[in-house]
Amino acid sequence: MVLSSEASSAADHSAAAPIPTSSWPQLLGRLTEGKHLEPGQAGWAMEQIMSGNARPAQVAAFAVAMKMKVPTAGEVGELADVMLAYARPMPADLIRDDTVDIVGTGGDGVNTVNLSTMASIVVAAAGVPVVKHGNRAASSLAGGADTLESLGVRIDLGPDQVARSLNENGIGFCFAPQFHPSYRQASVVRREIGVPTVFNLLGPLTNPARPRAGLIGCAFADLAEIMAGVFATRGSSVLVVHGDDGLDELTTTTTSTIWRVQAGTVDKLTFDPGDFGFARAELSQLLGGDPQANAAEARAVLGGAAGPVRDAVVLNAAGAIVAHAGLSSRAEWLPAWQDGLQRAAVAIDSGAAEQLLARWVRFSQHV
């Protein structure tokens, strides 16, 4: 490793900082000229989108122009804050303040197995509370929600049910369409555009449970630092990761780049899994299939099957445990990784991960 230096309610949103008067021609004009937006303008645009006042063409133009201009952390933070203001609220008194998320932007175009989904179960089985935010597949064959559904987990639970799942099972799943109904129009436009836009960054930044820690995958190396900047302003303990093979995960085929966010600062590192004894994998060994195939792979890995997929799951689970450890100012990088890797492996080999999945399935079907 080398260090290189649904809306909560209209009332809730009205309590936010005032958004300056703007217009789509003014805003899009700045973006097409390659200029950054004035403070508040990105928030104004997202308010128009979430309130249903933006037309599809305006949403599409904004999404693409923002990506081409390259957004700033401030702009992306405004988009995420407005989206969260419209999200269905979680019962804050039931959500622990040390929860983690393991999620990626998607958009890497590789169609791997659902590593973050499997890793989430392993992390929860290791004793770290997980509230995962996710959706169905946009471009791949199976998204995290698709695979969880094939495993038997009900994905359409509401806020109180997810909170109960977290408290009783150590894990919960926030299905994005269930928690962000006001984002529906933008979601449709995003699918129709068919290319990555600034909206790809918002999923990992808008978990309605607002976890303070996480392993966040970013398929876009040029935008990962921007995401890290948003998390830094929130005081999060997060590892934003980009596989140097293009994956929005910690990869085992080569090195990964990590933006370590802790105590409001961002450090950029190169991470080599070989330093911890992981064998190099071929990308083809990590490829997935449809939801049923990915669910079968998940059952095998959680049941103790060895191989490249298990290695990648353990690595990503350990990364989330490291991020969780970063909530403490006493956490040290190498010892945290050694601890995380051991806990992830034990969670699988002891049967704890497999048992947790079974409990989660039973709970979700009867809640």
UniProtKB/Swiss-Prot annotation:
Q: Which residues bind Mg(2+) 1?
A: 116, 249
Query: Which pathway, per its entry?
Result: Amino-acid biosynthesis; L-tryptophan biosynthesis; L-tryptophan from chorismate: step 2/5
Tell me the residue numbers annotated for binding anthranilate 1: 104, 135
Annotated Mg(2+) 2 binding lies at 248-249
> Which top EC class is given?
transferase
Q: Which residues take part in binding 5-phospho-alpha-D-ribose 1-diphosphate?
A: 104, 107-108, 112, 114-117, 132-140, 144
Q: According to the UniProt record, where is the region Disordered?
A: 1-22
Q: Where does anthranilate 2 bind?
A: 190
Annotated Gene Ontology cellular components are: cytosol
Gene3D superfamilies, alphabetized: Nucleoside phosphorylase/phosphoribosyltransferase catalytic domain (3.40.1030.10), Transferase, Pyrimidine Nucleoside Phosphorylase, Chain C (1.20.970.10)
Task: Tell me the cofactor note.
Answer: Binds 2 magnesium ions per monomer.
Which prosthetic group or cofactor does it need? Mg(2+)
* Ranges of compositional bias, category Low complexity: 1-17
InterPro entries with a match to the protein in the record: Anthranilate_Pribosyl_Tfrase (IPR005940), Glycosyl_Trfase_fam3 (IPR000312), Glycosyl_Trfase_fam3_N_dom (IPR017459), Glycosyl_Trfase_fam3_N_dom_sf (IPR036320), Nuc_phospho_transferase (IPR035902)
Q: Which reaction does it catalyse?
A: N-(5-phospho-beta-D-ribosyl)anthranilate + diphosphate = 5-phospho-alpha-D-ribose 1-diphosphate + anthranilate
A single Gene Ontology MF term assigned here is: magnesium ion binding
Q: Name one Pfam family in it.
A: Glycos_trans_3N
One example of a Gene Ontology biological process annotation: L-tryptophan biosynthetic process
Per UniProt, which keywords does this protein have?
Answer: Amino-acid biosynthesis, Aromatic amino acid biosynthesis, Glycosyltransferase, Magnesium, Metal-binding, Transferase, Tryptophan biosynthesis
Q: What does this protein do?
A: Catalyzes the transfer of the phosphoribosyl group of 5-phosphorylribose-1-pyrophosphate (PRPP) to anthranilate to yield N-(5'-phosphoribosyl)-anthranilate (PRA).
Whom does it interact with, and what assembly results? Homodimer.
Q: Which family does it belong to?
A: Belongs to the anthranilate phosphoribosyltransferase family.
Q: Known PANTHER family for this protein?
A: ANTHRANILATE PHOSPHORIBOSYLTRANSFERASE
Q: What is this protein called?
A: Anthranilate phosphoribosyltransferase
